[in-house]
Each structure stands twice: as C-alpha cells, then as structure tokens.
Amino acid sequence: MGSEHPVDGMTRRQFFAKAAAATTAGAFMSLAGPIIEKAYGAGPCPGHLTDIEHIVLLMQENRSFDHYFGTLSDTRGFDDTTPPVVFAQSGWNPMTQAVDPAGVTLPYRFDTTRGPLVAGECVNDPDHSWIGMHNSWNGGANDNWLPAQVPFSPLQGNVPVTMGFYTRRDLPIHYLLADTFTVCDGYFCSLLGGTTPNRLYWMSAWIDPDGTDGGPVLIEPNIQPLQHYSWRIMPENLEDAGVSWKVYQNKLLGALNNTVVGYNGLVNDFKQAADPRSNLARFGISPTYPLDFAADVRNNRLPKVSWVLPGFLLSEHPAFPVNVGAVAIVDALRILLSNPAVWEKTALIVNYDENGGFFDHVVPPTPPPGTPGEFVTVPDIDSVPGSGGIRGPIGLGFRVPCLVISPYSRGPLMVHDTFDHTSTLKLIRARFGVPVPNLTAWRDATVGDMTSTFNFAAPPNPSKPNLDHPRLNALPKLPQCVPNAVLGTVTKTAIPYRVPFPQSMPTQETAPTRGIPSGLC
C-alpha cells in the first residue's frame, strides 16, 4: 500500500475524495483520476532546476482564464476586486436576448449537463482576430467585448458567447489537474489576436513586425505559407547549442495539417526547413504524435525540449468538446508516466495559444507606443493582412489557462507571476543556457521565466501506480456536439446558447487552499 503523505494538511486519498465529491462528472473522473493520482504520487528528491531534464510544451486552443478557471479557488477570478475590474459588459440585453447598447451582461455558465444541442459542451467559436481583440481591449478599458463580436456574428444570438464560462462540474479533469499541480493565473497569450501569431511567439518569440523576413503575421492564413518566413526560431537556437529537441504533431488530418485547421507545427513554414535532410525538417516536421512521442518516452529518447500538438480535433478549439481536450492532456501525461525514469525528470507545461475571443477581466500589460519590436512598423499598415490599420500594441494578449505538471510542481499550487508564451522559451534559457535572441527588451523585463512555478523544496510523495483510461467517458459527449462542432467552427453559426435571465455575478470556490511553490532553491 502506498504511503499517505499529507499535502497542505490533506492526505492524497482525502484530496481525491474531496475532488470527486465536488463534481457531478464522477464517472469521468473515476477513470482519469488514477492517472492523475499516479502523477501526483511520483516523488523525486527535492532538488534544483538542473534536475529537470525534459521540458515538454503542449499547446491547446482558444480558451481564456476566466472562461475556464474564473471560479477556481485562490486565483484571480470572479471574486477579484483589483481595479480596474469590468465584469458587467454592455452590448447585449439578457432579458430581450438581443443586441442592445444599453443592455448589460455578466459572465454566465455554459452548462454541459443540459440535453443534446443546447448543452454548453460545444459552443460557437467567437471572433478572436487582431481587430476583434484590440476592439475588446479598447485601449486598456477592457469594456468592449460584446460590441466587438457583433460584426463577426452571422447569428445575433451568438454575440454573448464571449461572456460564457465553465465550472468544476463542466471541466472536472481540468480542475483536478489544477488541484494536483501548479496553476498560473497571470499567464497571458503573447499577442492580442489569434492562433498563428501566438504560436509563432511560442516557437520563436517573434512575428516579424518590421516585415523584413516574411511578416508581419497577424492572422491565421487558410493555407499555411510553407517555407515563407525566414526569421530565426527557437529550434535553431537549440540546434546550435547542441540541445536536443523535437516537434511532435498529430498528422491524422493529412493534407489538412497545412491549412487553418491543421496547425502544422509551424517549422515547415520557414525557409530554413526546406531541405528534408536538414535537422529542422527531421526533428521539426517528421515526428508524429502520439506514436513517435510514446516511442521516445518508452525508449528513453525523449529530447531535452519537446513541442507537442495533439491535433485539431482534440485541441479544445470551439466548437469541439472541451472534455475531449482534457483527454488529450491526460493522454500526454499517461505517456510520460509510462516510464518513471523519464517522468521523474520532466516538466509538462500545458497552455492555450490565445483566449479565443472569450472574456477575461484582467487587463494585459502593454508597452508604451514606439517600444521596439512591440508595434508593427511596416510603412503601409493597410497592406498587412488582417491589420485593420492597427499597429499595436502587439501584446500582451489576454490571460489563458496554464498548468505546470511535474513531480516538482505537486499541488494544489498557484503562481500569480506574469508570464506569456515567451516565458516557456525563457525557461529553456534558464535551464539549458540557450539564448532567445528575438525576445524584446520590454517583454524580457515584463514576463517571468516560469522557474517560480516549481516547488523544488517539496519532499518526495510516492504512491502506488495506478493507470486507467478516460476516453470512454469523453466520447459519449461527441454525438450531441456534431452539429455545433461543424457549424460553430466552420461558419460560426452554431445553435446559440441562451443567456440566462435574471443574471447574478458568479463567485469562486472556497477550497482547496492553494500554496505558493518555492521556486528555485
């Protein structure tokens, strides 16, 4: 029998009993729980940053922090009173269910327990463009979320979807992971806009705002521009430093991987990867997920740095099921846990590329006008696709969820520090000494390097290994999502989710209490 080391005054068994009691999705959790419990129990000795030999970066799609974790305890969520706070957004009238400049809408729950077609599991994909997100931000007032959606909503009833959120009942696995490891409530996407430019920041800390190397990149092209960009990306820095790396991509969609729904890992968008014999192509384009990733873990060949793309259908991108995305995260964790020698030296960082058009109440840090590298400087701004004449600021974008999953980040822990996608590159820099030359001075000074998310002072916490598979409980949610997944993703015409009326302001959970990790020690 595994030992019962207490965590924040609560044994592991008590923790999971409490977590299971907090959700109606007990069956779903009963299958995923053992996987997470095994991860929770892995117990390397207290140590240092150098004890982490593998950094695995897994990026999901289009969710804001408030949208997923606004009700999570001890975080900067719906109970936040730090000014300026604008939870009540003007532009939609919940009583008349219509666009109304005088109407006020509060954040409201997407209830995933409702019947087919009207459940909140699969909702319409809000606009999250460079134009739309700058309009929502509104010069820092953060008060224009609903009007910003109107021009991009073919069905008026989908305008207020920007204000929807989930709770523990709707996202049992996400909340269980947040309770078990480190959650970051100050993690922002890198750019006020969509997927491709934010993923470029994740991979390179740059979108070429001066237009010298194929940019600026402000939108998601329908067809990825293969071998078009030429600025330096982080894999090249790792290669030069002799630090092993790979990009693992799910290639289920075949040729569609090079389209707006594929997210091809971005390495093959760069001229440097044109030669299939180059290491950029061999390690940045060829590896598959999950097969090659699982094989490398099994055979002790996992590189020092990995970028993981589970695939669009599992990405949590609206209007696909949110809990199927949870399966993708747990599956990656399960692969790492399959080899304890690898898991004990690994940090898995799960983040989301951008907020997806979903409301977040925290105003992101932004630089003053003219800050080098943080505004688009090409002479003809109107010639830049998707710019709408807006030069910036580029970022930071709005908050997104981020979980740090590692034997060195056992929780429940929280970190309030400011991070963005370039923080993962700064962590690589801190651990392996590899420079991030594209990182601007302003951004380098503004965001942390994520070393504070680890609790290196914590003692080992071994437990009995126990694995199971959650997929059987996620798949039944798919049939009711088929119409919305197609309509809401492709044409943004999903069946609208009706805003409840009368409304009341949501509140946060009061438990569990979250500690602060020690960071470097």
UniProtKB/Swiss-Prot annotation:
EC number: 3.1.4.3
Induction of the gene: Expression is induced in vitro in the presence of phosphatidylcholine. Also induced upon infection of THP-1 macrophages.
Alphabetical GO biological process terms: symbiont-mediated disruption of host cellular anatomical structure
One function term, GO molecular function aspect: phospholipase C activity
Reaction catalysis annotation: a 1,2-diacyl-sn-glycero-3-phosphocholine + H2O = phosphocholine + a 1,2-diacyl-sn-glycerol + H(+); a sphingomyelin + H2O = phosphocholine + an N-acylsphing-4-enine + H(+); 1,2-dihexadecanoyl-sn-glycero-3-phosphocholine + H2O = 1,2-dihexadecanoyl-sn-glycerol + phosphocholine + H(+)
Segments of this protein annotated with the region Disordered: 501-521
Role description: Involved in virulence. Induces cytotoxic effects on mouse macrophage cell lines, via direct or indirect enzymatic hydrolysis of cell membrane phospholipids. Hydrolyzes phosphatidylcholine and sphingomyelin. Does not have hemolytic activity.
The protein's name: Phospholipase C B
Organism: Mycobacterium tuberculosis (strain ATCC 25618 / H37Rv)
